[in-house]
Amino acid sequence: MTQQRTLARYLTEEQRNKGVITGDLKLLIEVVSRACQAISIAIGKGGLGGVLGEAGSDNVQGEAQKKLDVLSNDILLDANEWGGHLAAMASEEMDLPHLVPHRFPKGEYLLTFDPLDGSSNIDVNVSIGTIFSVLKCPEGADLSTPEAAEQAFLQPGTAQVAAGYAVYGPTTLLVLTVGDGVAVFTLDREQGQFILTLENVQIPADTKEFAINMSNQRFWEAPVQRYVAEMQVGKEGPLGKDYNMRWVASMVADVHRIMTRGGIFMYPMDSKIKGQGGKLRLMYEANPMAMLIEQAGGAATTGRQRILDIQPEKLHQRVPVILGSKNEVERVTGYHSA
């Protein structure tokens, strides 16, 4: 019988045998995974736990917070601030970085996260998730105040040392990269551990599925209008094949489908959101997903630029996102430069 490989064993092998990660990064990822387990338990209780519904507050983006948004954010903060692996954390739900309290030791890493992606789907029981990214804290970074600490986070996605997401669906999955391919872990609730169930994930280069919010079609730029119109024409058109559309309105769920069977996900620039730069947040949504997608052989761009090459200007910066099967992403990106 083949012995199960837990997340802890997988990370130990990445550290000991391959030298890909440090001991502190291994421990940090394990702590994040335990926080995701706690979030999964809270979500699973639903109305029985009194965690559904609105929190009665807005986040820094002006979005109404769900009770589970706030709870998930608190779980991640509480789990990670005392372990000695982090210098600071940043979240979609907080205006400024969260500094490690003085009573705890500080480490060399920075953690950014969207504690509960797709939270508008909570009350209708659709898959949601947690997205996270890990960066090295620059030497000599000013962490004296939350305002000063923001500068330490403003690194391009190529600087990420790990990225991942948890999917809270029929099963709870953790999808992870430490820069050595993509691995998928399934939560064994009886053991209370994530078990490796898929390694070296590869996204097909071609696809017949696309994910986009068609209700925004009239606001899209011409290159995306062209690409979607060509897909809708099907095999009689220039792409020569019929496409299916899928849209969950939960980035984690949509991206995980692409990670599993290929496809292209688009939240492109449109005229409604041009002033804010895009819809999705660069630091804790686009960058970690782009790292995962590229590690699995896909591509991720804004339509005009590789996402991982963007130099962030602010913590909550937004960007257009086009990611997934490489040939499809390159096609629509090429339309932007035509």
Swiss-Prot record:
Q: Top enzyme class of this protein?
A: hydrolase
What GO molecular function annotations does the UniProt record carry, in alphabetical order? Answer: fructose 1,6-bisphosphate 1-phosphatase activity; magnesium ion binding
Cell compartments where the protein resides: Cytoplasm
- The record lists Mg(2+) 1 as bound by 92, 114, 116
Question: Which keywords accompany this UniProt record?
Answer: Carbohydrate metabolism, Cytoplasm, Hydrolase, Magnesium, Metal-binding
Give the pathway listed in the UniProt entry for this protein: Carbohydrate biosynthesis; gluconeogenesis
Q: How is the cofactor bound?
A: Binds 2 magnesium ions per subunit.
List positions binding Mg(2+) 2: 114, 117, 285
Q: State where substrate binds.
A: 117-120, 213, 279
Reported EC number(s) for this entry are 3.1.3.11
Reactions catalysed, semicolon-separated, are: beta-D-fructose 1,6-bisphosphate + H2O = beta-D-fructose 6-phosphate + phosphate
* GO cellular component terms given for this protein: cytosol
Q: Name one GO biological process term.
A: fructose 1,6-bisphosphate metabolic process
SUPFAM superfamilies of this UniProt entry? Carbohydrate phosphatase (SSF56655)
Question: Major place of localization?
Answer: cytoplasm
What cofactor does this protein call for?
Mg(2+)
Instruction: Show the disulfide pairing.
Output: none
The record's listing under InterPro entries reads: FBPase_C_dom, FBPase_class-1, FBPase_N, FBPtase
Q: Which NCBIfam families match?
A: PRK09293.1-3, PRK09293.1-4
Q: Matching PANTHER family, A to Z?
A: FRUCTOSE-1,6-BISPHOSPHATASE-RELATED (PTHR11556), SEDOHEPTULOSE-1,7-BISPHOSPHATASE, CHLOROPLASTIC (PTHR11556:SF35)
Subunit info here reads: Homotetramer.
Q: Which family does it belong to?
A: Belongs to the FBPase class 1 family.
- Write the protein's name: Fructose-1,6-bisphosphatase class 1 1
List the source organism.
Dechloromonas aromatica (strain RCB)
User: What lineage, starting at the top, does this entry show?
Assistant: Bacteria, Pseudomonadati, Pseudomonadota, Betaproteobacteria, Rhodocyclales
Gene symbol? fbp1
